Structures are given as C-alpha cells and as structure tokens.
C-alpha cells in the first residue's frame, strides 16, 4: 500500500501541465496552498476542490494510479474526520452512540478539515507528477537565486528539496518491505488495542532509519563518483523558458486567491 503514495512520483506525459515551466507550477501551487488556509467557508473550499480535480484531469495522470496513490492518504483523512467528530462538541446533537454524542459541528468541522487536507495533498502531488526531477531542481534553483545575495547556496538547497521529495516513494517502499518481513515472522499489526499496535511498530524504526541512511550514503557516493562538486560553475543542457502560458497560469492563481480572500472578508 505504501509504495503507491503519489507524492514524489513523476508520471511522464505530454499534457498542458507537463509542458509548463516548473517555476510557474511551483509559484501557482504555492499561492493555492496558502489560499487553502484562507478558505474558511464551504463555497471557497469546494471551489478549490473543483479546481484541483480539474487540474488533475488536465494532467492526464491515469485515474487508477491516482486512486492507488491517494488510498494511503485516505486513512489519514478518515482518522482526522473521526477525531473531529469525537472531540468537537459544537452545535446540536445528531446522534448518541452509548456515552459518545456526535454533534453537528463536529461532523461539519471534520468534513471541512478532511477536504482541506485532501486538497493540500493533491495540489502538492501535482508538482511532482507533472515535473521531471531535473526540471524541478532547475525550477527551484531559479526561484532560490535571490538567496545567493545573502550567502545561501541556491543550487544545493534546490537539489536537497528535490531529492527529499523524490525520496518519499522510496522510503514508503522500504517501509512496506520491512512491514511484510515482520508480518512473515508472526508480528501482528492489525489486532489488539492501539497501544499494542504502536508498540509493534516501534521495532520498525531502527531498520527503517538504517536503510534510509544507507540509501543516502549510496546516493552521495554515486554523485561524488560522477564528479559532482556543487552548483558553482555548472552549466545546463536545457535552459528553462518562460512564456505566455506560464504567465496566464500564475495570474489565474493570483485572481483565484484574491477572489477567495474577498469572499472571506465579505
């Protein structure tokens, strides 16, 4: 299940989003991610959900791939929803399950936060799904260029963020392998109280971190063997080109953001 997480994965394609400059995608998604937290009503929230679904359709990423990738996230969304339903005591009581009273405010807040969380994940995934690792690194480096004036290494920061994003699927695959190995040895992760399940998961941390550090070391050695010495003096085979489509996308994101802020204040 974990190996299907879509964050950090790239799907090769020829869609409108794939052809955009990575900088325009990064700027637009960053604007929309901020605006999500300004959307404090259902109309604004559903508007962002509709926009996200439309962008996913434009990306032409296979629906089955999206479903498999979002399935692990749905457990977190469901957990968030249940937590709000159980802990929020606002509004009239809808039903009572033994000692637990379910309030209207809890259900509405839970659905609202769950929708926001799912939108955040889908928007973040759009960047990596439609942007190759090289383009993503180049785009981040270009956006970080002003940081050079204060002595920060723009290329190294961009490379670090790109590697971190791409490492997520690998990390999830490693978690899945270790889980299956432990289950083959008779460890039960699916039954018993929550405290017992958490204790059963703790032994996974050591091999998981060892594997993560081993992969990081292998990557560092591979980069060093290929002569990587940082971004200073490096040239690029492909130069990023900003055009009218990129300006349109960024301006559209700004207009949507301003509209949602006006709805909030209105």
Swiss-Prot record:
Membrane topology: Multi-pass membrane protein
InterPro entries the record matches: ABC/ECF_trnsptr_transmembrane, EcfT
GO molecular-function terms, A-Z: transmembrane transporter activity
Residues spanning the membrane: 29-49, 50-70, 73-93, 117-137, 152-172, 243-263
A Pfam family of this chain: CbiQ
Protein origin, superkingdom: Bacteria
Assigned keywords, A-Z: Cell membrane, Membrane, Transmembrane, Transmembrane helix, Transport
Record's subcellular location: Cell membrane
Record-level GO cellular component terms: plasma membrane
Role according to the record: Transmembrane (T) component of an energy-coupling factor (ECF) ABC-transporter complex. Unlike classic ABC transporters this ECF transporter provides the energy necessary to transport a number of different substrates.
Entry's family note: Belongs to the energy-coupling factor EcfT family.
Subunit structure: Forms a stable energy-coupling factor (ECF) transporter complex composed of 2 membrane-embedded substrate-binding proteins (S component), 2 ATP-binding proteins (A component) and 2 transmembrane proteins (T component). May be able to interact with more than 1 S component at a time.
Protein name: Energy-coupling factor transporter transmembrane protein EcfT
Native organism: Alkalihalophilus pseudofirmus (strain ATCC BAA-2126 / JCM 17055 / OF4) (Bacillus pseudofirmus)
């Amino acid at each position: 299940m974990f190996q299907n997480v879509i964050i950090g994965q790239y799907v090769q394609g020829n869609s409108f989003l794939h052809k955009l400059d990575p900088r325009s995608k990064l700027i637009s998604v960053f604007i929309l991610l901020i605006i999500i937290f300004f959307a404090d009503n259902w109309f604004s929230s559903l508007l962002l959900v509709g926009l996200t679904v439309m962008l996913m359709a434009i990306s032409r990423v296979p629906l089955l791939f999206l479903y498999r990738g979002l399935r692990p996230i749905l457990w977190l969304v469901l957990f968030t929803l249940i937590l709000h339903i159980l802990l929020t005591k606002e509004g009239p009581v809808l039903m009572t399950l033994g000692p637990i009273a379910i309030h209207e405010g809890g259900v509405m807040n839970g659905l609202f936060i769950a929708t926001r969380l799912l939108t955040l994940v889908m928007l973040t995934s759009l960047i990596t799904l439609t942007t190759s690792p090289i383009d993503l690194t180049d785009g981040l480096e270009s956006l970080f260029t002003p940081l050079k004036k204060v002595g920060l290494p723009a290329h190294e920061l961009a490379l670090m963020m790109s590697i971190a994003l791409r490492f997520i699927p690998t990390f999830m695959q490693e978690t899945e392998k270790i889980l299956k190995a432990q289950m083959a040895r008779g460890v039960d992760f699916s039954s018993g109280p929550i405290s017992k399940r958490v204790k059963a998961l703790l032994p996974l941390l050591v091999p998981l971190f060892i594997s993560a550090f081993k992969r990081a070391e292998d990557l560092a050695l591979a980069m060093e063997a290929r002569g990587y010495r940082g971004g200073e003096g490096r040239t690029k085979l492909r130069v990023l080109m900003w055009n009218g489509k990129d300006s349109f996308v960024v301006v559209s994101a700004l207009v949507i953001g301003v509209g949602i802020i006006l709805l909030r204040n209105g």
